[in-house]
Amino acid sequence: MLSTKSLIVLVLIAVAALVWLPRKSVEARLLIEAPPKAVWARLTDTGNYAAWNPIFVGLSGDMRPGGELALDMKLEDGQLSQITVTVDAMSEYQIIQQSAGVPGILTAHHEWSLEPAKEGTLVVQRETYRGFGVLFYDPAYVECFMRKVLKI
């Protein structure tokens, strides 16, 4: 059996590992010639994701803070995988934040940011991955698809 001192050391090591876990991020930006309201309408229309999104070809669920969405994700090899994300935050016509994964193993935090611009809307899409799984995960294909997705 572990002593109290050993247990405290293990807990501190675990907490430190979680704080300094590996991280990778991808980002894509595009100026869309439409007002933020129109872009927002497209992003929040869960029934029509397949019409414009080459990664998430199906989406169902509750698009609101605290809601869960089931996403049919097209993988790099063309196969489909379903993942569940939680909508962490939404600010109408400005931002949608979602997250998924198992803390410590691999988590993904996804953000759509809409910024009004003279010519329309600057859409910034970011995804940050954290956890030990990052050491074995290359999100380069996600960044490539993100650039395609932004052509909404």
Each predicted region: which residue ranges?
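Non-transmembrane interaction and regulatory regions of membrane-associated proteins
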Residues: 55-57, 96, 108, 121, ...
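A conserved amphipathic terminal alpha-helix motif
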Residues: 2-8, 126-152
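Hydrophobic ligand-binding cavity/cleft-lining segments
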Residues: 2-64
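Solvent-exposed, acidic/flexible segments
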Residues: 32, 36, 42, 80, ...
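Glycine-rich portal/gate segments that line the openings of hydrophobic small-molecule binding cavities
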Residues: 5, 31, 50-51, 60-109, ...
